[in-house]
Design a protein with these regions (language model features):
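A composition-driven surface/loop motif
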Residues: 1-161
């Protein structure tokens, strides 16, 4: 299934450990640094599924190192405005995700079966996307413009607070 969270406080708030085996989780928000898009106290193990979680950077977390699904955890140098589009692709141009946030954000976590260890990914911002916007995602759309803001590799994850 699919879960869409539009959060003013913590997005996914678990007072313990998390295991995700499938499905899609999209978190839009929070914007205040005392909350996180993903907030858990134990471990977060991801063995299936897809996550896009955009929110504040103050308490940002991502799935942990024991996950078989890899993650990219981005922290932007400046807050991105509501409506900003972020596009992530391989150096060879294979799309990982094109995402449009409904709220301002400074951190973005993407967890996807498409991500692999040892691969460098290009991150673009300030762009446009065409096609159907499905809960912030453009699964069959086209991306254009924008500026490459950084390159990154998969993260080892964060383990609870």
């Amino acid at each position: 299934g699919t879960i869409l969270v539009s959060a003013n406080g913590d997005g996914l708030d678990i007072n313990g450990s998390v295991t995700m085996t499938g499905g899609t989780l999209i978190v839009q928000g929070p914007t205040a640094n005392n909350n996180g898009a993903l907030d858990y106290d134990g471990t977060f193990t991801m063995t299936g599924g897809f996550i896009v979680a955009a929110g504040s950077a103050g308490m940002a977390q991502s799935p942990g190192a024991s996950s078989t699904i890899k993650s990219i955890a981005l922290r932007f140098s400046a807050v991105q405005p509501a409506g900003a589009i972020v596009h992530i692709q391989t150096a060879g141009g294979e799309e990982i995700v094109t995402f449009k946030s409904e709220k301002s954000f400074q951190s973005l976590v993407v967890s996807s079966p498409k991500l692999q260890s040892g691969v460098t990914y290009d991150v673009y911002t300030g762009s446009t996307a065409t096609g159907a916007n499905q809960m912030g995602l453009y699964p069959a759309g086209a991306y254009s413009g924008g500026t490459k803001s950084t390159t990154t590799t998969v993260s080892t994850g964060a383990t609870g607070r």
